[in-house]
């Protein structure tokens, strides 16, 4: 089922979500399916549960090819509960980001280039992966959504913040 995506300005996006405690449950599997369906319908590359007004530390992400980010390499489709992120170096990389909760806008955001993320699959099995580049960016962006942070709070140069159909995408 496609869920409504709440937008910036809704205070529910600014809360720290509590951990998922019902790993392996039918309810969680249904929620994950709804999140993937919602993300795909919105042409997104990631979605956090708080974006559909579900107060849980749960994110989904991944794609083979993205209409919104055509240059991005594929990212494995993943449902990740109770995520933790560890930078693997201090290397930062600037890149364009948008958000399904902030439709029509984008900005250049600095993110760690190399990370390790950990958490749990919906069935309760552990997940631990190293990621770099756009994959790392997507995970960090969705993690921010779990801790009440939206990408505009990370903008360093507001000259790069604007509407998708107006911006020049030269970095």
Curated annotation (Swiss-Prot):
Fe cation binds at residues 99, 141. The active site is at 142. One of its GO terms (biological process) is co-translational protein modification. Binds 1 Fe(2+) ion. Its EC number is 3.5.1.88. It comes from the Bacteria. Removes the formyl group from the N-terminal Met of newly synthesized proteins. Requires at least a dipeptide for an efficient rate of reaction. N-terminal L-methionine is a prerequisite for activity but the enzyme has broad specificity at other positions. Belongs to the polypeptide deformylase family. NCBIfam families: pept_deformyl (TIGR00079), PRK00150.1-3 (NF001159). This is Peptide deformylase 1. It comes from Xanthomonas axonopodis pv. citri (strain 306).
């Amino acid at each position: 089922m496609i869920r409504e995506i709440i937008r910036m300005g809704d205070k529910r996006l600014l809360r720290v979500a509590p951990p998922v405690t019902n790993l392996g449950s039918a309810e969680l599997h249904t929620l994950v399916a709804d999140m993937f369906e919602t993300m795909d319908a919105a042409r997104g590359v990631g979605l956090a549960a708080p974006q559909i007004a579900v107060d849980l530390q749960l994110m989904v992400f991944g794609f083979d090819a993205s209409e919104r980010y055509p240059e991005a390499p594929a990212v494995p489709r993943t449902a990740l509960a109770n995520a933790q992120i560890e930078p693997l170096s201090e290397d930062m990389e600037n890149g364009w980001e948008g958000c399904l909760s902030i439709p029509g806008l984008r900005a250049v955001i600095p993110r760690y280039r190399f990370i390790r993320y950990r958490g749990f699959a919906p069935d309760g099995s552990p997940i631990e992966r190293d990621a770099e580049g756009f994959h790392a960016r997507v995970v960090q962006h969705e993690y921010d959504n779990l801790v009440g942070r939206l990408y505009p709070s990370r903008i360093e140069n507001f000259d790069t913040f604007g509407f998708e159909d107006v911006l020049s995408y030269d970095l």
